Amino acid sequence: DVNLKKSRIEIIEKSNKYLNKKWRFFKCDLLEKLKLSEIFVKYKPEYVINLAAQAGVRYSLDNANEYINSNILGFTNLIECCRHSDIKHLIYASSSSVYGGNINFPFKEDQGVNHPVSLYAATKKSNELMAHTYSELFKIPSTGLRFFTVYGPWGRPDMAPMIFAKNIFSQKPIKVFNNGNLTRDFTYIDDVVETIYRLLSKPATVNYANPMQSEVSDFACPHRIFNVGNGKEVNLLDFINTL
């Protein structure tokens, strides 16, 4: 929802004036490689948080090119800019959808994720592979975050929590599949923000003199993956009743 994004920006701009922070907004498509590169050259960012993507599983079934353009080509342009800049840490959004058809719960970062069941999941897995490769080749410290069903104020209107809430306020019935015998790991937006904030200044480190003492399992590469979730299964009907 473009209007939702514009409203978010207006709130940030008002807060920026009040707090006297040096915050700038640039309207830029990640496919605009030259414009993106000019921003990096001029402002020389030290930290990059990439939350830009074409999201959603169902939409990807009929709109493949939008996912390739945004999540693959756009991500490539961004990480190339990081490569040619003195970036201290790149944090990027992956997704819990990369776990695909895994049936071993709870999901763990060291599980295999080689069988995505949607194009969206495949693009997010690709992001992880690309970030790992750039960390290996160019020593870019990077962290991928696999988010689990994020909800909260200003959330995406196509997500279940917002759809449920809208139907409740409109006094419309809520469509429930599988008789409600579904569970999800719902993650509140404030927890996501806190996670990113805490990780930003703590990139993965590699002890090249003594690689075995490095904090990452792939000790030659400053790249890591974290699950970001509530850590508890919530029954769908319980969630609806809480709303």
Q: What are the functions of these language-model segments?
A:
Residues 1-150, 199-200, 234:
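N-terminal Rossmann-like NAD(P)+-binding domain of SDR-like oxidoreductases, especially those catalyzing
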Residues 4, 22, 166-243:
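C-terminal substrate-binding subdomain of Rossmann-fold SDR/epimerase-dehydratase oxidoreductases
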Residues 34, 73-76, 162, 190, ...:
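Surface-exposed alpha-helical interface segments used for non-catalytic interactions
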Residues 93, 159, 182:
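A conserved catalytic-core signature of glycosyltransferases
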Residues 119, 157-158, 189, 236:
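Amphipathic alpha-helical segment in the mid-to-C-terminal domain
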Residues 126, 130, 134, 164, ...:
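Hydrophobic alpha-helix immediately C-terminal to the catalytic Tyr-X-X-X-Lys motif of short-chain
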Residues 154:
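Conserved GTPase G-domain signal focused on the G5
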